[in-house]
Regions:
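Flavin (primarily FAD) binding-site architecture
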Residues: 37-52
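A conserved short coil-to-beta-strand element within the FAD-binding core of flavoproteins
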Residues: 5-19
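Active-site substrate-recognition segment that forms the wall
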Residues: 85-121
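N-terminal Rossmann-like dinucleotide/flavin-binding domain of flavoprotein oxidoreductases
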Residues: 1-2
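Central beta-strand plus flanking loop segment that forms part of the substrate or channel wall
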Residues: 50-85
Length: 172
């Protein structure tokens, strides 16, 4: 088996019987006995492969995260971690202003990752605040703000997260 990273796959290659037998990336075509799709919950490749449509909004969440750079000693001191250990916190209720979802924070050696995850349906309906505002509010919460004080934001990211379990996986 061979794993190839960093190549955007444009389409799947099918043989005469319709079996997937590889991928197409730009002008390159790579054949394979097995192709594993890793393009996320809203997979355009799965739609192409088996006609799978995007999952319902009620079964998908959106997560946003920021990474705050601090030196290793500051991270350990602020989160009361022993040498070589880390911490992980989960937040419910106030982190998403009462709508479906929650917040999270975990340590890395020289940084703290902080984020929120909330249902897309709640975001689209206008029931809650926008997800970016939820993250801003969490960053300013009196329990969180001192932990990231004077830290430099070095990364922002966002992802769609499946919440429907195996029931929303496309058929094989």
């Amino acid at each position: 088996a061979e794993t190839i990273y960093g190549i955007p796959v444009e389409s799947l290659v099918k043989d005469a019987s319709g079996k997937i037998c590889g991928i197409r990336a730009g002008e390159d075509e790579i054949s394979a006995e097995v192709v594993i799709l890793c393009d996320g919950v809203n997979s355009l490749l799965a739609k192409d492969a088996v006609g799978y449509d995007k999952p319902p909004a009620s079964q998908v969440a959106v997560g946003v995260k920021e990474v705050f750079m601090l030196d290793e000693k500051t991270v350990s001191d602020r989160l009361l971690c022993a040498d070589g250990e880390g911490a992980a916190w989960l937040f419910v209720g106030d982190a998403t202003h009462g709508v479906f979802g929650g917040g999270f924070m975990y340590t890395n050696r020289e940084s703290i990752s902080l984020g929120v995850v909330t249902g897309i349906e709640a975001c689209a309906s206008g029931k809650g605040k926008p997800v970016y505002q939820m993250l801003e509010d969490l960053k300013n919460h009196p329990s969180v703000a001192p932990l990231i004080h004077d830290a430099k934001v070095v990364e922002h990211s966002g992802h769609m997260v499946p919440e429907g379990g195996v029931n929303i996986m496309p058929p094989l």
